[in-house]
Amino acid sequence: MKHRLISYFTATFLAATLISSMTLHAAPYAAVVMDARNGKIYHSRNADTRLHPASLTKMMTLYVAFQAIENNEISLDSYVTISRNAAAEPPSKIWLKRGQKIKLRYLIRAAAIKSANDAATAIGEAISGSEANFSKRMTRTARAMGMSRTTFKNAHGLTRAGHLSTARDMTILGRHMIYDYPQYYNL
């Protein structure tokens, strides 16, 4: 009985220690609730805390793609050749192969619906020549729309040093997506 009790308390202590250490490293809750029609904010918490945006990054990837399409830099029917870099991205992905050719419209769908990292990288490389150049363009676009605390380092959102945004900045981007390029909703 004594041995069972000691085992129970040891297991409980280890679990509590593990959970508390995980909690110490958890990102803070951050949110902004805005009426996109008028910009009125109804809820805000840690709105300007810089956090990793994860797959929300793909909103900017698509925004820049739509911008490039509108500027006649590329078309929805342009064939994109998949690079070794894009094909090597970790999941979530659609398992694109190096050298494969696929229309931009299908890469956009894969990035938007499947959150495909390989598709997002291929989009960036097709538009700007490299992931690094595309990331710089994403950051410039963010600044131009008032996203002052956002820096992009890739097109897909996987964690990378310096790849950060805020809830407020993502709200700004979401609003721009809704109003600047509604013609691409049913792509």
Located regions from the model:
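A penicillin-recognizing enzyme superfamily signal
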Residues: 184-187
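Bacterial N-terminal signal peptides
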Residues: 10-21
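Active-site-adjacent loops and short helices of periplasmic peptidoglycan-processing enzymes
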Residues: 22-168, 175-182
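Bacterial N-terminal signal peptides that target proteins for export
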Residues: 1-12
